[in-house]
């Protein structure tokens, strides 16, 4: 007898598979000099938001992760020469996140990898199925944030 289906179980299984596939994709070329998955996402986020200043609180909110987690990741990125945190003139408490040339080079490589990964995820799915997935994912997020 099969156990009852569970959305949570399916999402956890997908998350594990995605993590494993992404790690394989990124570790193949980078070896020891690579970035973590979260660092790659942050670099991409900062590039995608270059029209405005990006702060730690933006990462906390938009990635839905705790302050301590973001602090640790940003400290490591700073130590590894990927970002610089610069004070802003209008608020001494805030430090904007600026990418270094090293991070920009990594981003260029990552873009192609993410395109390949996204293509792999979408194999066999129609545009309608992808749109349905996004709609369901949005509803699940709202359910969990409530």
Predicted regions and their residues:
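N-terminal positioning helix adjacent to the helix-turn-helix/winged-helix DNA-binding module
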Residues: 3, 38-42, 55, 102, ...
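N-terminal helix-turn-helix DNA-binding core of bacterial DNA-binding proteins
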Residues: 23-69
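Charged, amphipathic alpha-helical coiled-coil/dimerization segments
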Residues: 75-135
């Amino acid at each position: 007898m099969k156990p009852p289906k569970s959305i949570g179980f399916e999402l956890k299984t997908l998350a594990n598979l995605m993590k494993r596939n992404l790690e394989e994709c990124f570790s193949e070329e980078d070896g020891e000099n690579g970035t973590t998955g979260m660092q790659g996402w942050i670099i991409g986020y900062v590039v995608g938001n270059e029209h405005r200043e990006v702060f730690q609180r933006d990462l906390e909110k938009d990635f839905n992760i705790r302050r301590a987690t973001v602090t640790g990741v940003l400290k490591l990125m700073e130590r590894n020469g990927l970002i610089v945190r610069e004070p802003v003139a209008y608020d001494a408490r805030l430090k904007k996140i600026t990418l270094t040339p090293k991070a920009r080079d990594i981003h260029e490589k990552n873009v192609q990898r993410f395109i390949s990964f996204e293509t792999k995820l979408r194999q066999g799915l129609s545009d309608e199925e992808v749109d349905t997935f996004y709609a369901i994912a949005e509803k699940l997020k709202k359910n969990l944030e409530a």
